[in-house]
């Protein structure tokens, strides 16, 4: 099992220059290799097998940065091509832009070239960087790779990937089940009748964000004031992102500890965001990110995340008698059945998802 820990790093001026240089060289290699592959295929109708080493003679400044960062750029390009050939809908690999807000590079542990201490991190071709380690790393975790990134706000982070050989937990029998139904207000509803109560951080910060973006639009592009204001806008977005992640981490941890199996619908969130004109609501919820967090936390505990088919009529079926309605408008917020059952439609759907999840679990057991 692999585990990642993201930490804040505090590079000095010289180290920031080295990080930016490595990011730039990694981007250059990716784009150059992609351009050469396209050009070669157009002429020869074959895939070019090029490597970063073949470019160092023509571009000697590539030797100044970590060679493993360039090798990882090659791996990322090859991965993009494999994904395209496997799923053409993903799109053909695209060039990486220098103006992209978030830039990063990845390097690997090889013969002790990376050292992690309580207050410092040693990276290849760089002096030790001051860090803030917010959690104790278990002694049996083995460091595999480090991804150094710069956020739009100008902050630098390092994502440490560890191999945890002794962390694999056997699946335990499930007794306590929970059903979760997606909801526009509050992110989701539980089969217990409770709501997640997500505070809609983006909606709350929308006025302030609009004000800061309006100020940015009045600045002269690429001026010093423009860069300062751009950073303020980025800090607003970063705060919203951090608030959302903090809420979701705490909620997913609580559910993973309380229940043996959590049942959810396998929704097409991207389609809902665009097709139903629910873009801001779906994206502010971050429901997909929440399910990802919940999934790996349940796996760590040896518990189960059960996905119910998205076409299962969870909203139309009565959770008491099983009667299925032919029509149910999106505006109908209460589920009223002929049997006398009257409850919130989202709670009714969550109960149905839980029962369908139980059925799937018993079939697979």
Identify the meaning behind each predicted range:
Residues 1-365:
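Nucleic-acid substrate recognition interfaces
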């Amino acid at each position: 099992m692999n585990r990642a820990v993201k930490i804040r790093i505090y590079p000095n001026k010289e180290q920031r220059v080295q990080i930016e240089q490595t990011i730039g060289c990694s981007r250059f290699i990716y784009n150059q290799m992609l351009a050469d592959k396209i050009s070669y295929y157009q002429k020869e109708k074959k895939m070019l097998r090029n490597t970063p080493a073949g470019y160092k003679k023509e571009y000697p400044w590539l030797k100044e940065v970590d060679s493993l960062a360039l090798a990882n750029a090659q791996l990322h390009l090859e991965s993009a091509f494999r994904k395209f050939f496997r799923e053409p809908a993903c799109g053909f690999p695209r060039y990486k832009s220098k103006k992209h807000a978030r830039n990063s590079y990845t390097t690997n542990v090889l013969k002790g070239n990376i050292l992690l201490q309580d207050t410092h991190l040693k990276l290849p071709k760089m002096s030790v960087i001051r860090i803030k380690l917010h959690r104790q790393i278990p002694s049996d975790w083995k460091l595999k790779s480090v991804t150094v990134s710069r956020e739009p706000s100008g902050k630098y982070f390092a994502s440490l990937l560890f191999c945890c050989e002794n962390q694999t937990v056997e699946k335990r029998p499930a007794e306590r089940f929970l059903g979760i139904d997606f909801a526009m207000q509050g992110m989701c509803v539980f089969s217990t009748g409770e709501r997640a109560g997500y505070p809609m951080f983006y909606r709350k910060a929308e006025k302030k964000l609009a004000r800061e973006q309006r100020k940015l639009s009045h600045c002269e592009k690429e001026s010093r004031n423009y860069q300062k204001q751009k950073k303020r806008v980025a800090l607003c977005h970063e705060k919203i992102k951090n608030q959302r992640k903090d809420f979701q981490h705490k909620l997913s941890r609580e559910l993973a500890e309380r229940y043996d199996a959590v049942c959810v619908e396998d929704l097409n969130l991207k389609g809902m965001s665009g097709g139903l004109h629910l873009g801001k609501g779906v994206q502010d919820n971050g429901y997909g990110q929440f399910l990802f967090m919940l999934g790996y936390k349940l796996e760590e505990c040896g518990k189960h995340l059960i996905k119910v088919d998205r076409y299962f009529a969870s909203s139309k079926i009565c959770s008491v008698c099983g009667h299925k309605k032919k029509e149910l408008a999106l505006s109908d917020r209460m589920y009223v059945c002929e049997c006398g059952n009257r409850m919130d439609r989202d709670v009714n759907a969550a109960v149905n998802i839980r029962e369908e999840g139980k059925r799937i679990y018993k079939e697979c057991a």
